[in-house]
Amino acid sequence: MTAPPPSLHSVAIFVTDLPRAVEFYRDTLRLPVTHEGSFGAELLEGPAHIGVHPAVHADAKKLVGRHTGITLFVTDLLHYCGDLHARGVRFLTEPTQQPWGIMAMIADPEGNILALWEDRTPEGTGEPVSQADGIS
C-alpha cells in the first residue's frame, strides 16, 4: 500500500516586530487571525495557514525582508489594491495583466514580499492595468 501524498500545512513569514506584523496582516490585509501567542500568529482559515513568527534565531533573521513566495488569491484585485493604497501599503508592482491573470506585488512593513493574484482572463499581457480600471 502506498502512503498518501503530503498536503500543505503552513508557510512562515519571519519578522522582528511581531505586534506590528500581526496588525499589518490582520488590520491592513484583513487576513483572519486563527491563533495568536508569543510564538507568533496563524492567519487564514482552512487546511493551510500563514504563520507570522518572530525571528529569534540567526538563521531566521536572515529570512526577514525577503520574497516569501506566497501568492494570495483575491476575487476583486483592483478594488482590494485600491483599499491597500488607501491604507498606505507599499506596492513593488502595481496590478498588471499577465497571461495567467492580474498580479500585484506588495511588501509588509519589514519588507517581506507577497504576490496578489486574480484569475481574470487577460485582454492583453504585461501591461499595467489603467487608472480607469479603478486604481488610483
Regions found by a protein language model. Give the residues of each.
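Vicinal oxygen chelate
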Residues: M1-P4, S7-T16, E42-L44, D59-S136
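N-terminal beta-strand motif that seeds the catalytic metal site of vicinal oxygen chelate
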Residues: M1-V22, H49, T68-I70, R120-S136
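Short strand-connecting beta-turns/loops that link adjacent beta-strands
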Residues: L18, E36-S38, A48, Q98-W100, ...
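Conserved active-site alpha-helix within GNAT-family acetyltransferase domains
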Residues: P19-T28, A104, I113
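Conserved acetyl-CoA-binding loop of GNAT-fold acetyltransferases
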Residues: D27-T34, V89-R90
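Conserved short beta-strand elements that form part of the metal-binding/catalytic scaffold
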Residues: P32-G65, I113-D119
